[in-house]
């Protein structure tokens, strides 16, 4: 194929004209057009739409510059009139009584002929034109490109709202457009003459009046040697237009090569193509598309990757591969415009927010140099090109999860950082304020150690991405770990075989601060670890290490859920892309695990209640949210009564409801000392009910011995001993001060190690040697010597850092990851995680010490 066969590509974009005060579609295109010079702007059927026409060019970056220039000119003129252009398939706020048809004989006749179809043409599209040698070749190209058109539609989907309501479709424009008698899938034509004859017959029939009214999804131009792509919605993001233009040109190139080689296009399956188009309009980029080859549904992202592979040779020939691959990654990372619009609406339920989002994305111009950056991959990944403002002074000292050692943004974060860069510091600061206000309104608060009042739980704006391969490894390793700890707890409160066999020293168990007599009350068949929270960190090499096991009352899952909701609400431009594990099903998974903790005596559907210490509890928000989401009671000790070993709670002071499972969200010592509904301590009656197998407690009493910091050092041995397996995950190297040799090593290296009291909770009592003052090291040395069995030492792990928005700039802050495992019949790793982030300059991420969290994206495999 000669390059002359594909001379250029051009784009026509249609823009709705909105009133910036009401965000309503207004019929003022004629007024706008009178202020615009040149042939690049023109009217459309309705007076509320302006069309722009780019110059044809062989260079996609030049095309991008041209489109941006046209958008700027249109935005400037409309802005002077209090108006704004909106590039989207539809807009949400429309008053049909205000709208009218453009003053043009052709348009007026179309309205007379087609009536409501013409009057409701409240849609805008983006059309791509690719030059070909002649119209016969153009007709042959149509058949070759047809199977990929639904994918291009999905990329463009930007019209979820229609006449003020969510249509349920990603591209409602497609359904409106297909009401025209000649819209949709093109037929099969061997030559341009056959096609022209069809057009002549349609005109003769009176159904259309001219060749320009043939609205096939792809067609030869009526007056130029080009192939026109007409299926796509208008796109707010100009880079989506460039992506579609580049892919379509590559498809045309590929088709011409096949035709010149004597190939025949696969016979079109019009019914399947129509079904595929409908599915793309329904689902957009976030759902499944139809595999035209007949293999069934396929995720849109997988279809996009297949298309990129298909046309890579053509993209490379035009030096477009790096650009298009980058833009495809960006499109997937941001999600479709339809998806972003729905998130904007979900935030406050206001259609004006949707309109504002589309207006902003249409007029926003990327920073200077962005065009060059987009076209210069692999240098495109350099941080000074991806996010020059936000990362200008960002200097991590160790392993950073977003910026690598060369200062380049890691590939999986490019789309995220581009979006944050486009928003800029001012908007990000505003969103922090919005976030805090929303948290206060919804009661998403936490009380840190030493605080007299609750405050908004710190949620950072920059999301964290866990690679799918990493998540697979973590899932396997954490399930293994919880199975071993479950076996250990049963053993320790039973025959203590691990002690007898020398796996765990007897003193480790006997001296454990959390060893409880009540732990023996739990039956041998009971599940002891219903909910585990395992903390992990990434070391200096980026590898994962288990830092701590939490088997008593691990908190955080509700904050992970609310973090996602807040992120989608406060930063709808960013939001998690399609293909990220959703969090909707977490309450159901938790309820399922809690039901499995019910005693055998429970009849029917076991009744579950969340047991909280009350509104003064630091994590009361989580307790109440989980109870609400699971549809179960939230009770305090004062609500509970143990009657003949049955546990009940009071409703309205008189009615009683049985409880089969108490999801314990308070320390067991506090629970045992708390007064029940009878006005007496609840501990002994509750213990009798547990022994009688009339109530299940999740997590079980006495579980604290399993997350003892000394016991942590022996978990790898437990995995081998109880399961006969090798540990999948590594631990932080740990020294037990109860062992004289190990204690000597700790004392000799206090200034290099992290030392922890075995009963420390939430980071309290931890001394980080390299950062500690000399007097603190002297203090801790004396405490270790006085009671060595109550201390451990660990190698200092250089925690990975993650960019965190703090005081109007990004800071590299230490992060860990809390992953939750729910144990019903088998341990199940919850498809969510809480990324906890330390304050700047600190290594302690615990919320009780002022730490916060980040939305965590886990891709589906």
Swiss-Prot record:
It catalyses: L-cysteine + L-glutamate + ATP = gamma-L-glutamyl-L-cysteine + ADP + phosphate + H(+). It holds the Pfam family CP_ATPgrasp_2. Coiled coil: none annotated. Gene3D superfamilies: 3.30.1490.270, 3.30.590.20, 3.40.50.11290. Keywords: ATP-binding, Ligase, Nucleotide-binding. It is an enzyme of class 6 (ligase). Its EC number is 6.3.2.2. The keyword Cell inner membrane does not apply. The keyword Ligase applies. It comes from the Bacteria. Residues 373-861 are annotated as: Unknown. GO terms for biological process: modified amino acid biosynthetic process. Residues 1-372 are annotated as: Carboxylate-amine ligase. GO terms for molecular function: ATP binding; glutamate-cysteine ligase activity. InterPro entries: ATP-dep_Glu-Cys_Ligase-2, CP_ATPgrasp_2, GCS2, Gln_synth/guanido_kin_cat_dom, YbdK. ATP-dependent carboxylate-amine ligase which exhibits weak glutamate--cysteine ligase activity. In the N-terminal section; belongs to the glutamate--cysteine ligase type 2 family. YbdK subfamily. This is Putative glutamate--cysteine ligase 2-2. It comes from Frankia casuarinae (strain DSM 45818 / CECT 9043 / HFP020203 / CcI3).
């Amino acid at each position: 194929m000669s390059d002359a066969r594909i001379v250029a590509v051009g784009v026509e974009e249609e823009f709705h004209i909105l009133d910036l005060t009401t965000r309503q579609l207004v019929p003022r295109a004629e007024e706008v057009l009178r202020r615009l010079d040149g042939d690049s702007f023109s009217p459309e059927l309705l007076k509320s739409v302006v069309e722009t026409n780019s110059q044809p060019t062989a260079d996609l970056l030049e095309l991008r510059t041209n489109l941006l220039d046209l958008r700027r000119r249109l935005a400037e003129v409309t802005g002077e009139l209090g108006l704004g252009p909106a590039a989207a398939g539809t807009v949400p706020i429309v008053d049909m009584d205000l709208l009218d048809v453009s003053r043009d004989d052709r348009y007026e006749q179309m309205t007379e002929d087609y009536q409501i179809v013409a009057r409701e043409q409240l849609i805008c599209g983006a059309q791509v034109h690719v030059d070909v040698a002649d119209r016969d070749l153009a007709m042959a190209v149509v058949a070759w490109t047809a199977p990929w058109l639904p994918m291009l539609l999905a990329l463009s989907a930007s019209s979820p709202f229609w006449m003020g309501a969510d249509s349920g479709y990603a591209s409602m424009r497609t359904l409106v457009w297909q009401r025209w008698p000649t819209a949709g899938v093109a037929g099969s034509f061997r030559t341009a003459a056959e096609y022209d004859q069809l057009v002549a017959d349609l005109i003769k029939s009176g159904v259309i009046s001219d060749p320009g009214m043939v609205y096939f999804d792809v067609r030869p131009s009526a007056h130029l040697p080009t192939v026109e792509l007409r299926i796509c919605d208008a796109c707010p993001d100009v880079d989506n237009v460039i992506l579609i233009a580049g892919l379509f040109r590559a498809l045309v190139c590929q088709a011409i090569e096949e035709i010149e080689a004597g190939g025949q296009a696969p016979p079109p399956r019009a019914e399947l193509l129509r079904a595929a188009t409908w599915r793309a309009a329904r689902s957009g980029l976030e759902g499944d598309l139809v595999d035209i080859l007949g293999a069934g549904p396929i995720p849109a992202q997988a279809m996009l990757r297949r298309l990129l592979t298909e046309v890579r040779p053509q993209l490379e020939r035009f030096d477009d591969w790096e650009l298009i691959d980058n833009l495809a990654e960006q499109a997937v990372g941001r999600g479709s415009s339809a998806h972003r619009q729905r998130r904007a609406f979900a935030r406050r339920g206001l259609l004006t927010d949707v309109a504002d989002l589309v207006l902003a994305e249409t007029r926003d111009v990327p920073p200077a140099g962005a065009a060059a950056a987009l076209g210069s991959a692999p240098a495109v990944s350099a941080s000074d090109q991806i996010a020059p403002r936000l990362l200008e002074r960002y200097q991590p000292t160790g392993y950073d999860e977003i910026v690598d050692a060369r200062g380049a943004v890691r590939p999986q974060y490019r789309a995220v950082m581009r979006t944050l860069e486009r928003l800029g510091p001012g908007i990000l600061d505003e969103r922090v304020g919005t976030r805090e206000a929303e948290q206060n309104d919804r009661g998403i608060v936490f009380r840190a150690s030493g605080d007299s009042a609750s405050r908004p739980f710190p949620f950072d704006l920059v999301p964290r991405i866990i690679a799918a391969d990493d998540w697979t490894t973590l899932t396997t390793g954490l399930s293994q770990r919880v199975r071993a700890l479950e076996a250990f707890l049963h053993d320790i409160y039973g025959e203590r075989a691990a002690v007898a066999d020398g796996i765990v020293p007897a003193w480790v168990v006997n001296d454990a601060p959390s060893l409880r007599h009540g732990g023996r009350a739990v039956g041998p068949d009971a599940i002891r670890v219903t909910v585990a929270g395992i903390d992990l960190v990434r070391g200096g090499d980026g590898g994962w290490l288990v830092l701590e096991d939490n088997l008593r009352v691990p908190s955080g899952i509700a904050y992970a859920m609310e973090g996602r909701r807040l992120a989608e609400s406060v930063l709808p431009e960013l939001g998690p892309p399609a293909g990220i594990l959703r969090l909707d099903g977490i309450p159901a998974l938790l309820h399922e695990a809690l039901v499995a903790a019910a005693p055998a005596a429970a009849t029917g559907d076991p009744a579950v209640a969340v047991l909280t210490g009350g509104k003064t509890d630091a994590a009361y928000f989580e307790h109440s949210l989980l109870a609400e989401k699971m549809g179960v009671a939230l009770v305090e000790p004062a609500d509970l009564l143990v009657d003949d070993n049955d546990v009940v709670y009071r409703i309205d002071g008189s009615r009683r409801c049985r409880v089969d499972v108490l999801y314990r969200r308070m320390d067991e010592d506090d629970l045992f000392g708390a007064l029940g509904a009878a006005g007496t301590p609840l501990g002994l009656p509750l213990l009798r009910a547990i022994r009688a197998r009339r109530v299940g407690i999740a997590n079980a009493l006495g579980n604290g011995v399993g997350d003892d910091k000394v016991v942590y050092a022996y978990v790898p041995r437990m995995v081998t001993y109880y399961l006969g397996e090798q540990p999948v995950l590594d631990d932080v190297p740990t020294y037990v001060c109860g062992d004289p040799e190990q204690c000597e090593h700790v004392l000799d290296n206090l200034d290099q190690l992290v030392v922890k009291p075995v009963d420390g909770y939430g980071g309290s009592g931890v001394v980080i040697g390299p950062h500690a003052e000399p007097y603190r090291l002297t203090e801790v040395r004396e405490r270790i010597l006085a009671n060595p069995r109550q201390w451990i030492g660990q190698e200092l792990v250089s925690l990975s850092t993650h960019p965190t928005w703090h005081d109007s700039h990004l800071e590299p802050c230490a992060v860990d990851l809390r992953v939750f495992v729910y144990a019903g019949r088998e341990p199940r790793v919850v498809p969510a995680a809480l990324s906890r982030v330390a304050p700047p300059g600190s290594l302690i991420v615990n919320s009780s010490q002022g730490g916060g969290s980040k939305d965590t994206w886990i891709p589906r495999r």
